[in-house]
Amino acid sequence: MAENIFLEVVTPGASVVSEEAQIVMAPGSEGEFGVLRGHTTFLTSLKIGSLRYKDAAGKERVLFVNGGFAEVLPTKVTVLAESAERRSQIEVERVRAAKARAEKRISERSVGIDILRAEAALRRAIQRLSVIETR
């Protein structure tokens, strides 16, 4: 059996994950990437999306990450995220309301509405919902 890699996910406010993982899959800025123990060292930016990993027992875990950076070393993956939430922390109704609000702002294109900001809010809401729906 292959050895595990250590995964650490931290935000400015908290340590979200700090445990052994069999594999880590993350939303890199150039596309999703997977990491096993012994991977070549690299550093990449992350986009908004789902960070998935199998814990040491083989159970698949999913987090929402709101951008950031990942440092991959042969024995460790460190994710520095702007924000990160476990599936259990995501409030479905709050996310649906945020999605509806962003869609409304984008469709209205009112004066004074920052469309890029509304589009970013919509992307975050869609990704959070996808984390909730992932089995």
Swiss-Prot record:
Disulfide bonds: none
Self-association state and partner proteins as the record states: F-type ATPases have 2 components, CF(1) - the catalytic core - and CF(0) - the membrane proton channel. CF(1) has five subunits: alpha(3), beta(3), gamma(1), delta(1), epsilon(1). CF(0) has three main subunits: a, b and c.
Function: Produces ATP from ADP in the presence of a proton gradient across the membrane.
HAMAP family: ATP_synth_epsil_bac
Keyword entries, A-Z: ATP synthesis, Cell inner membrane, Cell membrane, CF(1), Hydrogen ion transport, Ion transport, Membrane, Transport
Gene3D superfamilies recorded: ATP synthase delta/epsilon subunit, C-terminal domain, F0F1 ATP synthase delta/epsilon subunit, N-terminal
Family classification: Belongs to the ATPase epsilon chain family.
Organism: Desulforapulum autotrophicum (strain ATCC 43914 / DSM 3382 / VKM B-1955 / HRM2) (Desulfobacterium autotrophicum)
rRNA-binding among keywords: no
SUPFAM superfamilies hit by this protein: Epsilon subunit of F1F0-ATP synthase C-terminal domain, Epsilon subunit of F1F0-ATP synthase N-terminal domain
Entry's localization field: Cell inner membrane
The protein's name in its UniProt record: ATP synthase epsilon chain
Signal peptide: none
Topology relative to the membrane: Peripheral membrane protein
GO molecular function ontology, one term from the record: ATP binding
PANTHER family in the cross-refs: ATP SYNTHASE DELTA/EPSILON CHAIN, ATP SYNTHASE EPSILON CHAIN, CHLOROPLASTIC
Record's GO cellular component terms: plasma membrane; proton-transporting ATP synthase complex
